[in-house]
Amino acid sequence: MKRVALLVQYDGSYFSGWQRQKNAISVQEMIEDALFKVSNQMIKTFAAGRTDSGVHASGQVVHFDIDFVIPSDRYANVLNSRLPSTIRILESVEVKKNWHACYSAVYRHYRYVINNSKIPNLFLNKWSWHRYQKSLDEFLMSKALNGMIGEHDFYAFQKSGSTRSTSVTTIKSIEIERTEDLILIDIKATGFLYGMVRSIVGQLVLVGEKKISPEIFKDRWVGKKKQDVHESAPANGLCFVNSVYQETIFKRIDKNDLFPKFVIRGYS
């Protein structure tokens, strides 16, 4: 029996999220079905992040245990030939038996993309939130982030239905960058609450549109005023970029190649 890790990309718009569900198509189901076709074994997979319905991944990390003749580094190609084109395995490697895709992660990285152009762009629609009504002030949005780094209770940004025992987590970094009309919001944290990133982005957009002040933004999460957090950004703008571990797991793929990239209209 060996443990194999996969580096996975998927277009979340075709799936109900990572986790297997009874009446919907999930990424986990697709990968486990592909493993069954290969090995005739019922294999359970584990992921670094349980992305919600419609959320993409450019560097999801998955592991599974298997007793089969295929070399570990061959699973990427073998599975890709049995997966839909909306899921790609970038690399497969054997890892230690005590290594875990979720529990061994030091932190996870999500990126949210907002298209702030007044002109719609069909080729960006699937991968970004077209928020065009007002020009967003990214400097005000950045100001609102003051005090968020570190361990805090982010209950205000947790959607109902969470199975977590606590709403406390640690944000390692959160940055906002504008490239022409695209606004990129990168958040790295040890763990993410259910709906956390989309709730944060929804509130930041209100700050950027000057509908609420940076002070009100902070008061809502510090004061755990979940009842005041109504706006949530749509799923299509969110991408699980990668998860980081103490040791280097994947050798062939540079981490910079995992960032979602746009090469249209001058965006890159």
UniProtKB/Swiss-Prot annotation:
Catalytic activity: uridine(38/39/40) in tRNA = pseudouridine(38/39/40) in tRNA
Residue sites binding substrate per the record: 110
GO biological process, one term: tRNA pseudouridine synthesis
Catalytic activity, EC: 5.4.99.12
Leader sequence segment: none
Superkingdom of the organism of origin: Bacteria
Keyword tRNA processing in annotation: yes
Residues the record marks as active site: 52 (nucleophile)
Cysteines paired by S-S bonds: none
MF terms (GO), sorted A to Z: RNA binding; tRNA pseudouridine(38-40) synthase activity
Keyword terms: Isomerase, tRNA processing
Keyword Transport attributed: no
PANTHER family noted in UniProt: PSEUDOURIDYLATE SYNTHASE (PTHR11142), TRNA PSEUDOURIDINE SYNTHASE-LIKE 1 (PTHR11142:SF0)
Family the entry assigns: Belongs to the tRNA pseudouridine synthase TruA family.
Self-association and partners: Homodimer.
Function: Formation of pseudouridine at positions 38, 39 and 40 in the anticodon stem and loop of transfer RNAs.
HAMAP family assigned: TruA
Protein name per its UniProtKB record: tRNA pseudouridine synthase A
